[in-house]
């Protein structure tokens, strides 16, 4: 009896996702370009020639927004289904956090969000893909910002060591997560936001797990939410993935 190969469901999902992305993205791009052309043509026409010009322009612009959102959702799903190969380097977790916060300085200032950062006094060496880790932190910080509707919006970011592992904790003073929804927040496509894709937190957890880490959530309705990402130290990472890495690695962001 011939041996049967065990199928990898993640690989299958990745193959399906790639096929769907190709089939959907091309007509989606055409729709976006046509909506752009329609908007430009309408804008150039005299108002007297098109009595409903304002309404038609609004429809064209709405189409642009919808197609752009669909394209972003498609990109997010493809990233989840077929995670990119990690480019591991030696980083300081403090520096990754600092650079991510600097990237959001203007956004938070515009939204009236106060950020308080308390970083561990010494470097926290981790083996990581710096870009992916920053993406995960960026998603968590933007989630925290969107969860706050109070007059005084505050995000506290802390790094440290607990249970022998470096961590980063992002705490907001927002609405908190209802008890009934807490089991679902990492479920693909689950969202309670009007324009949410339901991809942000699943991608965060996927990235954290790719790094041998974990993510924990503590939340209280009306008070806020704390998301804690714990990662292995450099030597812990090597022990978890023996033979996967060379002894010498590039330094991607150590102080």
Region locations from a protein language model:
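Histidine phosphotransfer helical core of two-component systems
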Residues: 28-68, 88
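Conserved catalytic submotifs in the C-terminal HATPase_c
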Residues: 109, 114-124
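Detector for a conserved hydrophobic position within an alpha-helical segment of the HATPase_c
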Residues: 208-209
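Conserved HAMP-HisKA connector
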Residues: 2-23
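Short helix N-cap motif at coil->helix boundaries in the Bergerat
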Residues: 93, 176-184
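A conserved beta-strand-to-alpha-helix junction within the catalytic ATP-binding
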Residues: 89-101
């Amino acid at each position: 009896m011939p041996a049967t190969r065990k199928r990898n469901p993640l690989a299958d999902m990745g193959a399906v996702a790639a096929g769907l992305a190709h089939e959907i993205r091309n007509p989606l791009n055409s729709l976006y370009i046509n909506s752009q052309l329609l908007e430009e043509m309408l804008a150039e026409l005299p108002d007297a020639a098109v009595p409903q010009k304002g309404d038609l322009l609004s429809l064209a612009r709405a189409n642009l927004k919808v197609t752009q959102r669909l394209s972003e959702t498609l990109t997010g799903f493809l990233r989840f289904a077929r995670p990119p190969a990690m480019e591991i380097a030696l980083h300081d977790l403090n520096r990754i956090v600092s650079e991510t916060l600097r990237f959001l300085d203007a956004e938070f200032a515009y939204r009236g969000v106060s950020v308080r950062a308390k970083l561990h006094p010494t470097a926290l060496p981790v083996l990581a893909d710096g870009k992916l880790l920053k993406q995960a932190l960026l998603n968590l910080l933007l989630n925290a910002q969107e969860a706050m509707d109070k007059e005084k919006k505050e995000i506290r970011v802390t790094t440290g060591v607990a249970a022998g592992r470096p961590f980063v904790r992002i705490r907001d003073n927002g609405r908190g997560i209802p008890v009934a929804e807490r089991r679902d927040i990492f479920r693909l496509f689950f969202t309670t936001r009007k324009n949410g894709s339901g991809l942000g937190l699943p991608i965060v957890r996927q990235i954290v797990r790719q790094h041998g880490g974990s993510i924990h959530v503590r939340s209280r309705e009306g008070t806020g939410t704390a998301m804690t990402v714990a990662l292995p130290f450099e030597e812990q990472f090597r022990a978890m993935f023996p033979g996967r890495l060379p002894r010498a690695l590039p330094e991607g962001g150590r102080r």
